[in-house]
C-alpha cells in the first residue's frame, strides 16, 4: 500500500506553476489580482484592475501622484527656488511682526484702546452696510410697507366712524332715542330742546335710582 502511494506521488504533477502564478492549461492565477494573462492587450484595462495599497507610514498622496522623472539640473533648480521662497516667507513674517509692533506703539501713544477700536470698527461696518444697495432697497421696501399700513389704519378708522354715524342716523337708533326721551319726560320732566343723548341716559339713570330709594306713601303715613 505504501509503495503504491509513493508511485502515485511521484507520477502526480500539479497543473499550476506556483513560481510564476500561471496556469498553463486552463486557469491563470496572479498574486497582483489582474485577471488577464501576460501579454494580453487587455492586461492593463478593466474594472478589476487593482492599485497598490500604501503601506503603513507611507504617504498615500505621494503614491497617487508620483513625481515626474527630473534630471539632476532640474532638481537642483527646484531646490534653489524652494529655498528662495522659504527665505521670502520668513522675511515677510519678520516685516509683518515689526509692522504690528509699530502699530501697537502708535495706538498706545494716541490713547486708542481696544474698546474704542472695536466701536470704530462697528461704526464703520454699519456705515458700509447702510451704503450697500441691498440695505437701501430693504429700507425703501419697509418704508413703503409702513406707509401702506398707516393708510390702512386710517381707512379703518374712517370706516368705523362712518359706520357709527350711519348707526346713529338709522331709524332703529332714532326710535330707541325717542323712547328714552319719553321715559325721561315721564320720570323727570320734559327734556329741554337740544339736549344730548348722553345727558338723557344720565338723567334717566338718576331718576330711576331716586324712585327706588324713596319709601312708599303708605309707609310714610303709618310712621308716627
UniProtKB/Swiss-Prot annotation:
TM region positions: none
Residues found modified as Phosphoserine: 36, 40, 175, 223
Stretches for region Disordered: 29-53, 186-224
One term of GO molecular function: calcium ion binding
InterPro entries membership: TPD52
Composition bias, Low complexity: 202-224
GO cellular component assignments: cytoplasm; endoplasmic reticulum; glutamatergic synapse; perinuclear region of cytoplasm; synapse
Coiled-coil positions: 61-113
Tissue: Isoform 2 is expressed at higher levels in kidney and brain than in liver, lung, testis and heart. Within the brain, isoform 2 is highly expressed in the granular layer of the cerebellum, the cortex and the hippocampus. In embryos, isoform 2 is expressed in the epithelium of the developing intestine, stomach, olfactory epithelium, neuronal layers of the retina, salivary gland, kidney and dorsal root ganglion.
Keyword annotations of the record: Coiled coil, Phosphoprotein
One GO BP annotation of this record: positive regulation of cell population proliferation
Modification Phosphothreonine, positions: 35
Subunit structure: Forms a homodimer or heterodimer with other members of the family.
Family, similarity comment: Belongs to the TPD52 family.
UniProt protein name: Tumor protein D52
Species this protein is from: Mus musculus
